[in-house]
Amino acid sequence: MGSEISKKDITRLGFRSSLLQASFNYERMQAGGFTWAMLPILKKIYKDDKPGLSAAMKDNLEFINTHPNLVGFLMGLLISMEEKGENRDTIKGLKVALFGPIAGIGDAIFWFTLLPIMAGICSSFASQGNLLGPILFFAVYLLIFFLRVGWTHVGYSVGVKAIDKVRENSQMIARSATILGITVIGGLIASYVHINVVTSFAIDNTHSVALQQDFFDKVFPNILPMAYTLLMYYFLRVKKAHPVLLIGVTFVLSIVCSAFGIL
């Protein structure tokens, strides 16, 4: 492997990251755009090593949902590790471990703080007929957009400097990243998978027990989303079922159960 990644390559990566959500879907979220953005540099790193390139692309095509303005930092970090030939499990583990926290940080800074504050200030200007309002908001938004290039360079720089430490502690990092990754996935299950059983049982003429609210949620909150996710994982991993088939089955089950008053 071995290649020379230039600043121009990293800058290009930063701009390509702007299309992170161009192929957004609910199976892999941003995986398509993430892989597309990194592909030119991955080709430069792996050159004629098609199995290596295939493995890298396969890892990058796995589920990812992170903040579009900060994704460049993660891309730069992963590229620096790819360039140094780090273990695939370590690279994959760090990606899984970091995309969730990066999403949380980005949402807190940009969507929930900076942009709402700027929107309030600029709306005040605009309501008074001041042209500065829309111009200022647009300028801030553009600044945030172009900062993704800077974040990409920061991620690449940090990755290169930290690579020796990663090599020395790769097994520990991989294990820690795996544990953190599983924790993140658990949070994603609770956030994205919703099953609400409305079925209830009458005890007498005036009292009834709601199956989910009075039983499942009291014993183990979110047990149904977790159970259904594990069932889908079983069909995907063990039975090798096609994801589209499972999505279709889930869609049909939702309609049928809703029609019969179960969900």
Swiss-Prot record:
Q: State the organism of origin.
A: Escherichia coli (strain K12)
- Tell me where on the tree of life, at the top rank, the source sits: Bacteria
Q: Which InterPro entries match?
A: GatZ_KbaZ_carbometab, PTS_IID_man
Q: What GO biological process, any one, is recorded here?
A: phosphoenolpyruvate-dependent sugar phosphotransferase system
Disulfide-linked positions = none
The text the record gives for the protein's domains is:
The EIID domain, with its homologous EIIC domain, forms the PTS system translocation channel and contains part of its specific substrate-binding site.
Membrane-topology descriptor: Multi-pass membrane protein
The places in or outside the cell where this protein is found are:
Cell inner membrane
Protein name as annotated: N-acetylgalactosamine permease IID component
Q: Would you name any one GO CC term? A: plasma membrane
Provide the leader sequence positions. Answer: none
Q: What does this protein do?
A: The phosphoenolpyruvate-dependent sugar phosphotransferase system (PTS), a major carbohydrate active -transport system, catalyzes the phosphorylation of incoming sugar substrates concomitant with their translocation across the cell membrane. This system is involved in N-acetylgalactosamine transport.
UniProt domain PTS EIID: residue ranges: 3-263
Task: Give the Pfam families listed for this entry.
Answer: EIID-AGA
Keywords tagged on the record: Cell inner membrane, Cell membrane, Membrane, Phosphotransferase system, Sugar transport, Transmembrane, Transmembrane helix, Transport
Q: Which residues cross the membrane?
A: 61-81, 98-118, 131-151, 178-198, 215-235, 243-263
